[in-house]
Amino acid sequence: MTLSPLQVLLYKYIMSTFLSNLFARKKLLWPGMTDVHTHLLPGVDDGFSSEKDSLAMLAFLEGQGVERIFLTPHIMADLAKNRKDYLRDRFETFREDCAHIHIDLHLAAEYMLDECFYERMEEGLLSYDGKHVLVEVSCLQAPGDLFEKLYDIQLNGFVPVFAHPERY
């Protein structure tokens, strides 16, 4: 079977369009996004345990258009090592290892409103912008002084932001 010049032209057009769409850069999933709650700081809580896995996730997120990420490790009585200075040191070391990834990384924290919270607040809170603080409570039972703690957070110049509101 011989193709006419018009059929050849149409075939070439269809194939070139198909191939260019097949190999074209896909649309970004989250262009310009800021993620305000992650557990990407390796080895400090229930997030990634290895730096390799954290770096792989950051590379994936970069490829999807994410531009800024707040690393928000848990700070709670059950994780005594997770103090502000310790987390800052871990973050700075990790950020140096992320130099090849073009995402603006920041450190904040996810604070459990437990018996150690007031002590943590006296040390200074790791917040998003000097104003917003990520907090959580047990999904089994809120502390009896929940409203007092939320009020005290505000008296200290912060706006509490609940992590996982769907749990409550």
Segments predicted by a language model, with ranges:
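Extended substrate/RNA-proximal surfaces in nucleic-acid metabolism proteins
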Residues: 82-168
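An N-terminally biased module of ancient metal coordination in phosphate/nucleic-acid-related enzymes
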Residues: 9-102
